[in-house]
């Protein structure tokens, strides 16, 4: 047994199941089409469990198994060299990237790197008003992509109601599809 729930509730399965340890390629049990090319995230958003679970530095998995769903935590924050490494691995294996599942950081997104291989939706976060100019820049880059393929996770509950609604409406006006994500305590 593993995952974020076990990380925050370490003793929940005591006496019932084995927890902890390492289980390489565990994502395959959940989704046989999924893979990770890196773990961790240096951004350290206050509401995110990734830095606590996986660290605030990236662990690059050089020889990751190429599969159609890429679940990395923050693809566009990876070094340019490693992003290019991921893209070249997909090209060499001729496996289509159907879903860059975890998404891209709007502040560091470079469409040119990923447009060559991403066949699925584009996912971004719009966590607070400060992200506005960066999300708008990304939406302009992707203006020719259908609305349904521009998915923006809009965090709510972290700013006043009016600010949260403003961000939702901005995503719509910029041609994106808002996915509202309520902020939750990490131990909830």
Residues covered by each model-derived region:
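Anion (oxyanion) recognition and catalysis
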Residues: 91, 143, 169-173
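Conserved, mostly hydrophobic/aromatic
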Residues: 41, 45, 124, 171, ...
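Extended, charge-rich low-complexity interaction segments
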Residues: 35, 43, 132-135, 184-186
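Auxiliary Fe-S-binding modules of radical SAM enzymes
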Residues: 158-188
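Local cysteine-cluster metal-coordination motifs and their immediate loop/turn environment
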Residues: 36-51
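Core AdoMet radical
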Residues: 1-6, 49-141, 148-157, 177-182
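Glycine-rich beta-alpha loop elements in corrinoid/cobalamin-binding modules
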Residues: 1-34
């Amino acid at each position: 047994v593993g995952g974020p729930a076990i990380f925050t509730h370490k003793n929940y399965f005591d006496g019932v199941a084995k927890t902890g340890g390492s289980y390489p390629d565990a994502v395959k049990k959940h989704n046989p089409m999924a893979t990770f090319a890196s773990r961790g995230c240096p951004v350290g958003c206050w509401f995110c469990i990734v830095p606590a679970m996986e660290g605030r530095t990236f662990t690059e998995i050089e020889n990751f198994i190429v599969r159609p769903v890429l679940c990395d935590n923050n693809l566009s924050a990876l070094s340019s060299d490693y992003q290019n490494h991921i893209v070249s691995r997909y090209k060499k294996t001729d496996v289509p990237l159907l879903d860059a599942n975890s998404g891209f950081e709007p502040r560091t997104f470079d469409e040119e790197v990923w447009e060559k291989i991403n066949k699925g939706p584009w996912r971004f976060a719009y966590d607070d008003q400060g992200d506005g100019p960066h999300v708008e820049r990304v939406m302009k880059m992707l203006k020719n992509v259908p609305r349904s393929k521009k998915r923006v996770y809009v965090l709510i509950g972290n700013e006043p109601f009016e600010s949260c609604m403003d961000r939702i409406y901005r995503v719509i006006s910029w041609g994106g599809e808002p996915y509202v994500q309520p902020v939750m305590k990490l131990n909830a």
